[in-house]
Amino acid sequence: MKTVTVKNLIIGEGMPKIIVSLMGRDINSVKAEALAYREATFDILEWRVDHFMDIASTQSVLTAARVIRDAMPDIPLLFTFRSAKEGGEQTITTQHYLTLNRAAIDSGLVDMIDLELFTGDADVKATVDYAHAHNVYVVMSNHDFHQTPSAEEMVLRLRKMQALGADIPKIAVMPQSKHDVLTLLTATLEMQQHYADRPVITMSMAKEGVISRLAGEVFGSAATFGAVKQASAPGQIAVNDLRSVLMILHNA
């Protein structure tokens, strides 16, 4: 299986990489969070752009991206606008969603973008090609905050992401029972053993799904999300606690 290397970080080998999300609502809070996060230990910084209030102005978004990059020049930066339909904070048109992602790619400030699978195949493929032409990696994602699809359906979605050119397919689902958590882990293992030729990220959310955020190295998830301050999704745990558990499992 091939790995993804971003700023000397190798995703897809060894311990799952820890991603934390920055969720400032304006330039000042973005800067304050970025400076505060320098004290934490993690591998990838995700900027959740949907929390930023001035998304109507592409220039304001890029100014904030520059602030983050200046604060942490050596950390891989993932640009993510999470749509409202997949659990995000704001609703925007598909066209503006694509415009923001292309502007981020053009800026040279971000290393990766998050691109939602169900944006539309043609737009997704065009954006993937555009990102790759500018040496930007694509995390292609799907989130279900209401349920856990069947293992077969989750594998199909991850395989479709792979077929559309995702560098890292990602799926996050909400369990309604402990069996749902096992379904997510089953899908992850199935993908890893039979279909994946690149790193994959999976998680089951909320308290019941926490085990999936810890056991990625066992079942085949290459990264996991932790919280420095505020969690960006249900079930995230503090980065220091997360790293301790990941190290225990890695060294066992």
UniProtKB/Swiss-Prot annotation:
Enzyme active site: 143, 170
Gene Ontology biological-process entries: 3,4-dihydroxybenzoate biosynthetic process; amino acid biosynthetic process; aromatic amino acid family biosynthetic process; chorismate biosynthetic process
Pathway participation: Metabolic intermediate biosynthesis; chorismate biosynthesis; chorismate from D-erythrose 4-phosphate and phosphoenolpyruvate: step 3/7
The enzyme's E.C. designation: 4.2.1.10
InterPro entries to which the protein is assigned, alphabetical: 3-dehydroquinate_DH_AS, Aldolase_TIM, DHquinase_I, Type-I_3-dehydroquinase
Keyword Transmembrane: no
Keywords: Amino-acid biosynthesis, Aromatic amino acid biosynthesis, Lyase, Schiff base
Catalysis: reaction(s): 3-dehydroquinate = 3-dehydroshikimate + H2O
Entry annotated with the keyword Phosphoprotein: no
CDD domains according to UniProt: DHQase_I (cd00502)
Regulation: Inhibited by (2R)-2-methyl-3-dehydroquinic acid.
Domain of life: Bacteria
Assembly and binders: Dimer of dimers.
Function of the molecule: Involved in the third step of the chorismate pathway, which leads to the biosynthesis of aromatic amino acids. Catalyzes the cis-dehydration of 3-dehydroquinate (DHQ) and introduces the first double bond of the aromatic ring to yield 3-dehydroshikimate. The reaction involves the formation of an imine intermediate between the keto group of 3-dehydroquinate and the epsilon-amino group of Lys-170 at the active site.
Family in the record: Belongs to the type-I 3-dehydroquinase family.
Annotated protein name in UniProt: 3-dehydroquinate dehydratase
Organism: Salmonella typhi
Recorded name of the encoding gene: aroD
